[in-house]
């Protein structure tokens, strides 16, 4: 959701988000200010300026924007009934909009968690290395556990294969390290090698250095 201001085309974030469960306040955020050392934790609250999470990931240490939180924002549906839910979004001037819906609780066997592919924990150092690709994500870089897959596509355009991680790695709190083996080492000046991120038909330089 966006907040608009008269006389400008700027887009502003929602000032306050309240989630009510059965008319009781369950989760509330109030964005006014936060300390400099909390800045990067905003990545866990708002993803790419599109999604505002109403739960707190286990690796999220952001404190100043949360007014009231029950069970880290995770609702346990443990009764066979309808849970009445209501979101209230409020802008800086106090104008608000709301949306209501219901969650229907039904008795069922809890599904077993599926771990498909490569599993990284937010709490420990993680290293994956296979064939011509490696990735190291230090403890505290992820805000929550990540389950992903990796595949490669041969490329004639680049000096290495194209490596695809799905789903894409979310914003990190700390830098990760990626290593890719060259399939063609033809540059005499090794400083000219660098990694790129591919998005559709466009490539974006990232960084990198050559190591034999």
Residue ranges and their predicted role:
Residues 1, 112-145:
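Compositionally biased low-complexity segments at domain edges in trafficked proteins
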Residues 2-9, 180-184:
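Short amphipathic, basic-aromatic surface patches that mediate peripheral association
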Residues 12-76:
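Exoplasmic/lumenal beta-rich domain surfaces
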Residues 76-82, 187:
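Surface-exposed, short loops/turns at beta-strand junctions within beta-sandwich domains
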Residues 84, 92-121:
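Short beta-strand elements
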Residues 111-122, 149-200:
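Proteolytic processing hotspots in large secreted/extracellular or virion-associated proteins
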Residues 211-212:
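C-terminal beta-strand-rich structural cap/linker in extracellular carbohydrate-active enzymes
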